[in-house]
């Protein structure tokens, strides 16, 4: 079988020249989607067959569902389940072996609170995901955000802080513990640093992010991100082959300034 790190969505989706930083549409070879909405409750089921690059086709499919419930106008809770019914990919282990990606399961729960403590425009948000595959794999990831925005004012400014963490693999244990980011992506949220994303992706990392945004025009949004990256484990097998082992947990910082210009609603 193929022994490789999971391809990032910018490589495995939308064809061989997807142009991640231009925010192209996401495409799949096959998609099945069911949405059910009952008042403030939304239930979604899905099956996804990614449009992978033909030369690197891993035959990986995803199936699962989401449930979101707006408990009150200021409290929203939800959960997501994803499984991989088919995949030819495998994860490399420090000792030279590998474990299959097929059969992996992920369960995540999330919470969002708006206008916290009566402060208009404030919000707190968090999510935690557990990941497993029988007795061979145990991984996890999570994030927490605290922020404030002023949608009714000029330029609609916002300021937020996010801490995110993704488990790495400890070579001293029998289980594989490096988090699989699945189809995580999207320039707005989970491309954590234009350079660092290419090097490390969303695995084996603690990431601090401070973000400021503004809308100087109706179709233009400016976003400034400040990142600090810390590796959880010095073993990074599963990322870039040249970085299988790190010398330090402190891997770097990055500042990103991005402009999003919407030409039209289409």
Language-model-detected regions and their locations in the chain:
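Short, intrinsically disordered, charge-balanced linker/junction segments flanking boundaries
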Residues: 259-266
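Substrate-binding cleft and catalytic face of glycoside hydrolase catalytic domains
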Residues: 1-4, 8, 42-46
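C-terminal structural cap/anchor segments
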Residues: 158-254
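Short acidic, glycine/proline-rich loop/turn micro-motifs
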Residues: 9-11, 89-93, 235-240
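Signature for the C-terminal beta-barrel architecture of outer-membrane proteins
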Residues: 13-175, 210, 215, 228, ...
């Amino acid at each position: 079988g193929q022994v490789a790190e999971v391809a990032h969505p910018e490589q495995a989706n939308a064809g061989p020249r997807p142009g991640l930083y231009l925010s192209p549409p996401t495409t799949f070879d096959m998609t099945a989607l069911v949405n059910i909405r009952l008042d403030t409750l939304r239930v979604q089921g899905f099956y996804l067959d990614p449009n992978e690059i033909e030369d690197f086709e891993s035959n990986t499919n995803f199936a699962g569902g989401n449930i979101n419930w707006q408990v009150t106008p200021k409290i929203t809770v939800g959960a997501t389940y994803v499984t991989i019914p088919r995949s030819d990919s495998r994860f490399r282990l420090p000792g030279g072996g590998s474990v299959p990606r097929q059969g992996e399961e992920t369960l995540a729960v999330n919470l969002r609170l708006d206008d916290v403590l009566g402060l208009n425009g404030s919000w707190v948000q968090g999510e935690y995901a557990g990941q497993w595959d029988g007795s061979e794999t145990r991984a996890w990831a999570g994030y927490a955000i605290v922020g404030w925005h002023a949608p009714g004012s000029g330029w609609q400014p916002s300021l937020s802080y996010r801490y995110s963490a993704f488990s790495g693999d400890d070579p001293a244990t029998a289980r594989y513990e490096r988090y699989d980011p699945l189809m995580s992506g999207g320039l707005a949220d989970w491309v954590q640093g234009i350079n660092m994303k290419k090097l490390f992706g969303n695995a084996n990392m603690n990431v601090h992010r401070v973000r400021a945004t503004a809308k100087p025009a109706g179709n233009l949004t400016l976003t400034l991100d400040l990142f600090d990256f810390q590796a959880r484990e010095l073993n990074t097998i599963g990322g870039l082959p040249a970085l299988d082992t790190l010398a330090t947990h402190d891997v770097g910082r990055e500042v990103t300034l991005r402009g999003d210009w919407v030409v039209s609603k289409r």
